[in-house]
């Protein structure tokens, strides 16, 4: 393989690992919220969320790994991928829409303003999470794991940008363009699943003992969520710019 192809394979592996770790965090949230949440919903919604998480995470890993097989089996897979590219033009039309661009810009500014207010209070708080998961993991440790997952996701996205910048050749750029366009929608959907799991945990009456305790935990969880949303919004804007540049080529 060439230097560019080796870089692509390396970054795909790194990003796939980050998706896998992010998926583990999602299931930790869902499993921890299952007991109380099942009593309220009779477990239907919980099962739907778990299966949706399995499908989305599996699909995310498949989307990021499939270019490796394209490079290993170029002649056999290339016609199939080209046919798929021709039959799904709506993905690129949506990602290049002006309305989508404006929406991302609005969310970026709004969430940045909210995060500035909340993070100031979060950094000054040093209290530990009191209640443990069913697996006896401290919630403070869990919050740190969430932050590590978010930073791994950011690192993965930076690898994607670096890979696109260093890529040369029309075919490789075309593959990257396909991945980036598809990942924008997929990443947003996966993020919404994670947020829903967080709120299931946040409003379970297990560890929100007092109003003061509730406010502190909500501030901590909200800060983590806002930081993740800011990262995703910033990456979406970068993806739109890359889409426009690649489309011009």
Swiss-Prot record:
Belongs to the ycf73 family. The lineage of its organism: Eukaryota, Viridiplantae, Streptophyta, Embryophyta, Tracheophyta. It is found in: Plastid, Chloroplast. It comes from the Eukaryota. One of its GO terms (cellular component) is chloroplast. Keywords: Chloroplast, Plastid. This is Uncharacterized protein ycf73.
């Amino acid at each position: 393989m060439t230097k560019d192809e080796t870089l692509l394979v390396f970054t795909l592996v790194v990003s796939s690992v980050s998706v896998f770790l992010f998926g583990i965090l999602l299931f930790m949230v869902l499993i921890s919220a299952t007991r109380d949440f099942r009593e309220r919903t009779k477990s239907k919604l919980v099962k739907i969320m778990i299966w949706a998480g399995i499908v989305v995470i599996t699909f995310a890993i498949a989307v990021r790994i499939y270019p490796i097989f394209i490079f290993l089996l170029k002649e056999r897979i290339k016609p199939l991928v080209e046919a798929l590219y021709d039959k799904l033009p709506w993905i690129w039309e949506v990602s290049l829409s002006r309305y989508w661009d404006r929406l991302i810009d609005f969310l970026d500014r709004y969430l940045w303003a909210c995060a500035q207010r909340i993070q100031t209070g979060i950094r000054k708080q040093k209290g530990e999470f009191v209640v443990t998961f069913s697996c006896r993991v401290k919630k403070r440790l869990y919050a740190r794991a969430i932050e590590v997952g978010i930073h791994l996701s950011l690192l993965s996205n930076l690898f994607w940008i670096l890979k696109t910048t260093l890529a040369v050749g029309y075919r490789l750029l075309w593959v990257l363009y396909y991945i980036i366009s598809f990942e924008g929608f997929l990443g947003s959907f996966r993020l919404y699943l994670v947020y829903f799991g967080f709120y299931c945990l946040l409003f379970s009456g297990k560890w929100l003992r007092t109003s003061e305790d509730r406010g502190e935990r909500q501030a901590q969880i909200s800060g983590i969520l806002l930081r993740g949303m800011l990262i995703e919004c910033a990456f979406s804007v970068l993806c739109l710019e890359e889409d426009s540049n690649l489309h011009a080529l």
